[in-house]
Design a protein with these regions (language model features):
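Non-catalytic connector elements of ABC transporters
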Residues: 250-402
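Helix-to-loop junction immediately C-terminal to a conserved catalytic motif
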Residues: 51
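A short, flexible loop at the N-terminus of ABC-type nucleotide-binding domains that lies
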Residues: 1-6, 10-22, 70-72, 105
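ABC ATPase nucleotide-binding domain
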Residues: 5, 26, 62, 382-384
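Conserved ABC transporter NBD signature motif
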Residues: 59-67
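The feature captures the beta-strand-to-loop junction immediately N-terminal to the Walker
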Residues: 36-38
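Conserved coupling/switch loops of ABC nucleotide-binding domains, chiefly the family-specific signature
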Residues: 57-60, 110, 210, 390
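ABC ATPase nucleotide-binding domains
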Residues: 73-235
Length: 402
């Protein structure tokens, strides 16, 4: 059993800057938790504090209810795999893996059995006599994992272990780490800046930014229900489309006026959500993932077409079975939607001007579609949203509106 609890953790450096602040997190026994975030967000600092390599300025870390101390790491309860492998270059693969057991003066026979078992698990039996300089990057990483694995730790820490590998090897090693986790009784804590690694490996993902937890959830929850604007845009490739918009009542309909793109009629459910939360006649951020946008053809549904958005295709990318359409604002003078706004013409025009001058997000659009089609760069396309997948965020707090 290895349950971790981080209670009020802070890490403050001599200059007065905080690497970690107000950090509270529970990691359950046998979970695979991934810390992910941009460079400098504090994820590796948290891992090093769990490993005992750095001391928290405030707060405590507990493992199975006991305050973390140096003895836990020394006894082998915690093992860490580093980004740069941390192998002894003058030792063979066998001796690198066996090193911790030799230090403890474990009988040679038991060492041999354990090393061979780990080597077999990691596909290293054929290279046990080689030295690190004779190994590929993937083999070096397996040896580093073997060094940690042979200690049978309660907590397995990994600090960006795949960042030095090429794309093919990273994919292969992800699968191997996942298999290792399935057959292990340890709790895994993994650090990466790569969201693909995070989404494919973790049972729980902790998104960090500026030393604070933005959201800690399952991969599915994180993707479908981001807690704030940062998480929404950090998770997902290509990233979520986000625009500033104004919520306006137009006769019986509730419209979004999106600067540069036009107006969009909301479903009753989304309109009611914004009404209840008090966002009528206010600004919001609107987010939609590229795969949740669909193209509209005139005549399919004329009423829906009238309230669709429009932009010109700037770049068309075909990526095997998937296509990406990158569209940009058509420009106010020749935008179809701006010509059709009637009862709120002045509101829309003023809103377009305001958005274009101060919007921290541009009005460009990325759409992901299955397959390919006859798309022409420079032409204008109409599109709508899967309304069950629209996300709204508060302008001031950037928190999700739910």
């Amino acid at each position: 059993m290895a349950e971790l609890l981080m209670d009020g953790i802070e890490k403050k450096y001599d200059g007065g800057s905080f690497a970690i602040k107000n950090f509270d997190l529970q990691i359950k026994d046998k979970e695979f938790v991934v810390f992910v975030g941009p460079s400098g967000c504090g994820k590796s600092t948290v891992l090093r504090m769990i490993a005992g390599l750095e001391k928290a300025t405030a707060g405590s870390i507990y493992i199975d209810g006991k305050v973390l101390d140096k003895k836990m790491a020394a006894n082998g309860d915690i093992a860490m795999v580093f980004q740069n492998y941390a192998l002894y270059p003058h030792m063979s693969v066998y001796d690198n893996i066996a090193y911790s057991m030799k230090i403890k003066k474990v009988p040679k026979r038991q060492i041999k059995e354990n090393v061979e078992k780990v080597a077999d698990m990691l596909g290293l039996k054929e290279v046990l006599k080689r030295k690190p300089g004779q190994l590929s990057g993937g083999q070096k990483q397996r040896v580093a994992i073997g060094k940690a694995l042979i200690r049978t730790p309660k907590v397995f820490l990994m600090d960006e272990p795949l960042s030095n590998l090429d794309a093919k090897l990273r994919t292969q090693m992800r699968m191997e780490i996942k298999e290792l986790y399935k057959h292990s009784d340890a709790t895994f804590v993994y650090v990466t800046h790569d969201q693909t690694e995070a989404m494919t490996l973790g049972t729980k993902i902790v998104v960090l930014n500026n030393g604070k937890i933005q959201q800690a959830s399952t991969p599915k929850e994180l993707y479908n229900k981001p807690a704030n604007l940062f998480v929404a845009q950090f998770i997902g490739t290509p990233q979520m489309n986000v625009w500033k918009a104004k919520v306006v009542q137009e006769k019986k309909n509730v419209m979004l006026f999106i600067g540069g793109l036009g107006r969009y009629r909301l479903s009753e459910k989304n309109a009611e959500l914004l009404r209840k939360r008090g966002y009528f006649d206010k600004e919001v951020y609107v987010g939609i993932r590229p795969e949740d946008i669909f193209l509209q053809v005139k005549g399919m549904d004329d009423e829906m077409f009238q309230s669709s958005l429009a932009a010109r295709l700037k770049v068309y990318e075909l990526d095997g079975a998937v296509s990406y359409l990158h569209l940009e604002t058509a420009g106010e003078s020749d935008s179809i939607e701006n010509e059709k706004i009637s009862s709120n013409e002045n509101v829309a025009k003023n809103w377009n001007d305001t958005i274009e001058s101060e919007n921290k997000f541009n009005s460009n659009v990325t759409i992901r579609i299955e397959g390919n089609g006859d798309f022409r760069e420079g032409e204008e396309y109409h599109f709508g949203f899967d309304e069950s997948k629209i996300h709204f965020f508060d302008i001031e707090t950037e928190k999700a509106i739910r």
